[in-house]
Amino acid sequence: MGAFLDKPKMEKHNAQGQGNGLRYGLSSMQGWRVEMEDAHTAVIGLPSGLETWSFFAVYDGHAGSQVAKYCCEHLLDHITNNQDFKGSAGAPSVENVKNGIRTGFLEIDEHMRVMSEKKHGADRSGSTAVGVLISPQHTYFINCGDSRGLLCRNRKVYFFTQDHKPSNPLEKERIQNAGGSVMIQRVNGSLAVSRALGDFDYKCVHGKGPTEQLVSPEPEVHDIERSEEDDQFIILACDGIWDVMGNEELCDFVRSRLEVTDDLEKVCNEVVDTCLYKGSRDNMSVILICFPNAPKVSPEAVKKEEELDKYLESRVEEIIKKQGEGVPDLVHVMRTLASENIPSLPPGGELASKRNVIEAVYNRLNPYKNDDTDSTSTDDMW
């Protein structure tokens, strides 16, 4: 869904912060899409006696950004203020939290539906949501749709959320029970996710409850006991990231970046740029949350990174000089490098993660460069 631009919008929105023993950074980019429909939430220290708790989420909107924007501002309140979450006096139990998260999703969805019906023109937008609620003892992963979150523990992917796709047997069964069908892996041949907030055109089957509709607003919630020694970082991202990078790939790439910089915004920017250069055509948003035992900057890794950048710079110069008259285009340079066995490329990111370094050298050495052109405008990145 959605139209594409002639060239991607690469300006990024960034934020970072720390508290409760956590550090986070985030980056979002419109990319090739005509509109930016992603939104995000990052809150360290919750109100009402939950100062040691934190909440992070990414919302991937479709058919508009209204639902994503509303959820990023109000979902947390719907979760923490309902009676299921509060439970009895004192800190909420694990079951209180899980029930409260579910209730919060159903409540905000119903609230948005009522607001939409009161308007003359009903809002047809929807949004996925993936998030984490982090208490001193537990991490609660929350997922509704096909955005994804993962936990890297002891240098490996320890947990990741499951995408809610119409082709999933349990999702397909619910869709068919509601009178719908799954065609070309979409709900009624149209919507690519089987759970989402909003999308009220898919939630009007009479005699069915809110979690029995063609599209369900019910999140999956998983609680994981925190491990101070082994927990390293959490990644939350929309499908514009996961379309081109697998779980292990992204975990490896982020870990390698944390060994060369402690700037979490920069790490997230590298993730977004790398995914663009790997061919992602969607909006892209990523939040990186680091625990105290996250990888630290390594002098050895920094030295290897510097050596790699110098090697790439020299190879670009050699490729341009070898051309003789004129200058080869950047696509030719990238394809030449891609055909070579280059040591020490960042795992998961590979050559795409070094595109900015290569392009900077190319532009410096290219006397014919037109500043109005954008090498990313080609469909075939290399």
UniProtKB/Swiss-Prot annotation:
Keywords: Cytoplasm, Hydrolase, Lipoprotein, Magnesium, Manganese, Membrane, Metal-binding, Myristate, Nucleus, Phosphoprotein, Protein phosphatase
Residues bearing PTM Phosphoserine: S375, S377
InterPro entries attached to this UniProt entry: PP2C (IPR015655), PP2C_BS (IPR000222), PP2C_C (IPR012911), PP2C_C_sf (IPR036580), PPM-type-like_dom_sf (IPR036457), PPM-type_phosphatase-like_dom (IPR001932)
Its biological purpose: Enzyme with a broad specificity. Negatively regulates TGF-beta signaling through dephosphorylating SMAD2 and SMAD3, resulting in their dissociation from SMAD4, nuclear export of the SMADs and termination of the TGF-beta-mediated signaling. Dephosphorylates PRKAA1 and PRKAA2. Plays an important role in the termination of TNF-alpha-mediated NF-kappa-B activation through dephosphorylating and inactivating IKBKB/IKKB.
Catalysed conversion reaction: O-phospho-L-seryl-[protein] + H2O = L-seryl-[protein] + phosphate; O-phospho-L-threonyl-[protein] + H2O = L-threonyl-[protein] + phosphate
Comment on bound cofactor: Binds 2 magnesium or manganese ions per subunit.
Subcellular location: Nucleus; Cytoplasm, Cytosol; Membrane
Span of domain PPM-type phosphatase: 23-291
Organism superkingdom: Eukaryota
Modification after translation (UniProt): N-myristoylation is essential for the recognition of its substrates for dephosphorylation.
Residues with a covalently attached lipid (N-myristoyl glycine): G2
Subunit structure: Monomer. Interacts with SMAD2; the interaction dephosphorylates SMAD2 in its C-terminal SXS motif resulting in disruption of the SMAD2/SMAD4 complex, SMAD2 nuclear export and termination of the TGF-beta-mediated signaling. Interacts with SMAD2; the interaction dephosphorylates SMAD2 in its C-terminal SXS motif resulting in disruption of the SMAD2/SMAD4 complex, SMAD2 nuclear export and termination of the TGF-beta-mediated signaling. Interacts with the phosphorylated form of IKBKB/IKKB.
Residues bound to Mn(2+) 1: D60, G61
Keyword Metal-binding: yes
One cellular-component annotation, GO: membrane
Major enzyme class: hydrolase
Membrane topology term: Lipid-anchor
Name of protein: Protein phosphatase 1A
Claim: Magnesium is one of the keywords in the record: yes
GO terms of biological process kind: N-terminal protein myristoylation; negative regulation of canonical NF-kappaB signal transduction; negative regulation of non-canonical NF-kappaB signal transduction; positive regulation of canonical NF-kappaB signal transduction; positive regulation of canonical Wnt signaling pathway; protein dephosphorylation; regulation of canonical NF-kappaB signal transduction
